């Protein structure tokens, strides 16, 4: 696999300390970790993560019962993370602008696309809405 993505409970909570332990010849080239709070994102970066996913930004059916991290965490990530990061969780066309305005330049979308009545159209809408975003 080119990319390996792990949740906090899959890595740190399971005793992992450095993503270097996951790297091997023929193994993943990029390793990312989920985070739900600034301390987890900081720990992921210190542990060698190539990227960090922050969320869920809003309530989402893919993580029922998990509290939303809010746009404040997106703002924190934009100001503090020096590795690529992705906003994820509950993103939709209705709230996308607020996520981008908070500083996100990369997003992950699941439900708003997979639950759409016209999946290709939903994908095109997200791509169109993201076309103005510039990475730093």
Name each model feature, range by range.
Residues 43, 77, 98:
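Hydrophobic/aromatic ligand-binding patch that stacks against planar heteroaromatic rings
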Residues 31-63:
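Histidine/lysine/aspartate-rich catalytic loop segments that bind and position anionic ligands
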Residues 11, 16-37, 65-93, 126-136:
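Alpha-helix-loop-beta-strand connector modules within alpha/beta enzyme cores
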Residues 2-3, 28-32, 51, 84-86, ...:
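Structural preference for beta-strand elements that scaffold enzyme active sites
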Residues 39-42, 75, 121:
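A broad detector of short, well-ordered amphipathic alpha-helices
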Residues 26, 47, 80, 101-103:
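Structural motif
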Residues 6-19, 53-65, 93-129:
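Glycine-rich phosphate-binding active-site loops on the catalytic face of alpha/beta enzymes
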Residues 1-10, 38, 45:
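Conserved alpha/beta-domain cores
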């Amino acid at each position: 696999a080119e990319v390996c993505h792990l949740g906090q409970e899959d890595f740190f909570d399971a005793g992992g300390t450095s993503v270097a332990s996951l790297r091997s010849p023929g193994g993943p080239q990029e390793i990312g970790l989920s985070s739900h709070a600034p301390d987890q994102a900081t720990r992921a970066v210190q542990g060698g993560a190539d990227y960090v996913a922050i969320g869920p930004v809003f309530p989402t059916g893919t993580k029922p019962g998990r509290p939303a991290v809010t746009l404040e965490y997106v703002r924190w990530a934009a100001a503090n993370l020096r590795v690529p990061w992705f906003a994820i969780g509950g993103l939709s066309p209705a709230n996308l602008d607020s996520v981008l305005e908070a500083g996100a330049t990369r997003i992950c979308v699941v439900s708003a696309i997979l639950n759409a009545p016209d999946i290709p159209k939903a994908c095109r809408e997200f791509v169109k809405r993201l076309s103005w975003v510039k990475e730093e």
